[in-house]
């Protein structure tokens, strides 16, 4: 029997697919929709210290090759999501979950993580170090000194399972430098990648979204090659205890297969989930299993990370 089961840290999942933070995760109702689908798990909307309305609309647009957005981290506040996943966990009848959070300053991040540390929540936390769409706030993970200081500080008090959502890197030296930092800490996972920041899509001489004069994060087909490169680069550089979640350009079983081939333990779907809805998880799972059967693979471990190079 072909299995797409996988593991992140000590958490086991019966499938390798889930939503990406930002899609089908703003409200409890949306999260329950994902929970009831064939997704292995869900990740919440990135929760900040306070409720945020986000950037002015229109702030999202589908395009021929994917999407562009400048959402600006709209969310109901981290407490809303923390209380929800904590309540689900208490029932003992739900999948393991991911709680996505970030502060708009180091102090806010510390306040949020200490609150989670003091709570009953024992699931995974995804610390978002890569949102490109908050005006005046740079992507943290592009500043290696700040990233190192942040991780060094948080692991002095935070002992629950935690991973980080990364922006795309484009330079081999940056892969080396980032991995050297991440390998110093007990991270459960890294998520590669968030949208490619500050793209521009034009239609009939006009930009598609309002914030930042049309500049926004690019998702979908545009970013799959970059996402695959980041997944594989970190798979080759990170210690085995740090799992990799692949995100970017996944809309078919073949896309998911390629992320796993590059080293991903789980795969998140964003733009295509927004376009198709939670039924996408059933379709992509079937397509992935069909590929595995055709190639004689029984489990993800049979091919994870086994990308072949040209002689």
Swiss-Prot record:
| EC top class, as a word | oxidoreductase
Q: Which InterPro entries match?
A: Aldolase_TIM, DHO_dehydrogenase, DHOD_1A, Dihydroorotate_DH_1, Dihydroorotate_DH_1_2, Dihydroorotate_DH_cat, Dihydroorotate_DH_CS
Query: What EC number(s) are associated with this protein in UniProt?
Result: 1.3.98.1
Primary place of residence? cytoplasm
Per the entry, the cofactor note is: Binds 1 FMN per subunit.
Its cellular-component GO annotations read:
cytoplasm
**Cofactor(s) recorded in Swiss-Prot or TrEMBL:** FMN
Which Pfam families does the UniProt entry name for this protein? DHO_dh (PF01180)
Sites binding FMN sit at: 45-46, 128, 165, 193, 220, 248-249, 270-271
Indicate where this protein resides in the cell. Answer: Cytoplasm
| Keywords from the UniProt entry | Cytoplasm, Flavoprotein, FMN, Oxidoreductase, Pyrimidine biosynthesis
Listed under catalytic activity are: (S)-dihydroorotate + fumarate = orotate + succinate
Q: What pathway is it annotated to? A: Pyrimidine metabolism; UMP biosynthesis via de novo pathway
The record's listing under PANTHER family reads: DIHYDROOROTATE DEHYDROGENASE (FUMARATE) (PTHR48109:SF1), DIHYDROOROTATE DEHYDROGENASE (QUINONE), MITOCHONDRIAL-RELATED (PTHR48109)
Extract the HAMAP family matched here. Answer: DHO_dh_type1
The protein's role, per its UniProt record: Catalyzes the conversion of dihydroorotate to orotate with fumarate as the electron acceptor.
Q: Which family does it belong to?
A: Belongs to the dihydroorotate dehydrogenase family. Type 1 subfamily.
**Oligomeric form and interacting partners:** Homodimer.
Name-wise, this protein is Putative dihydroorotate dehydrogenase A (fumarate)
From what organism does this protein derive? Streptococcus pyogenes serotype M5 (strain Manfredo)
